[in-house]
Amino acid sequence: MSFKSLHERIQKAVADTGYSKETPIQERAIPRILKGADVIGIAQTGTGKTAAFTLPILSKLTESTEANETRCTRVLIIAPTRELVSQIHENVRTYAKYTNLHTVAIHSAVSDNGQIDKLDSGVDIIIATPGRLLELVERGHGRFSGLKHLVLDEADRMLDMGFIPAIRTICKQLPKSRQSLLFSATMNPQIESLTK
């Protein structure tokens, strides 16, 4: 199977990267995400998991006829480390290069002013570490009323690092009617409960 179910602009960006065949996690996750289903994916690093959630989300945003006139964030991706946030942000920028989608990476290594300006002016996609995002949300930054997709990446690592309370606090700020995607190398009931 190829990436034919994705919007043509996203297909073009994928072709530019040289990928021609979906990995097993992509084969299973992409169709479900495109249909709007919540997904819990068990996948190790290096299996194409980032593309498994970013590609269908970008495709859905690109196909959406709703203009993001309110400049509310439509996608929130939470990851445990600034390195992973930066990597996901780069992947999103690569796959979204033929779209007009706006993204920001939120973590401690980026200046406050740049992050706050982008959050307050509105971006389509936020990729963030939980602690840094919670700090900014508690200071009144970020608009989540139009949020459509929540992704928790490497949820097992976030549990190990003690981020679960921060994630629960952030999730209380989000609309209940959203698509929730959780990816983890392992699964347990505490991790699974994060999507609810």
Question: What is each of the regions a protein language model found here?
Answer:
Residues F3, H7-K12, D16-Y19, N68-E138, ...:
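Conserved nucleic-acid-binding Ia/Ib motif block in the N-terminal RecA-like helicase ATPase lobe
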Residues A43-T47:
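The conserved Walker
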Residues M1-I42, D153:
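Conserved pre-motif I regulatory segment
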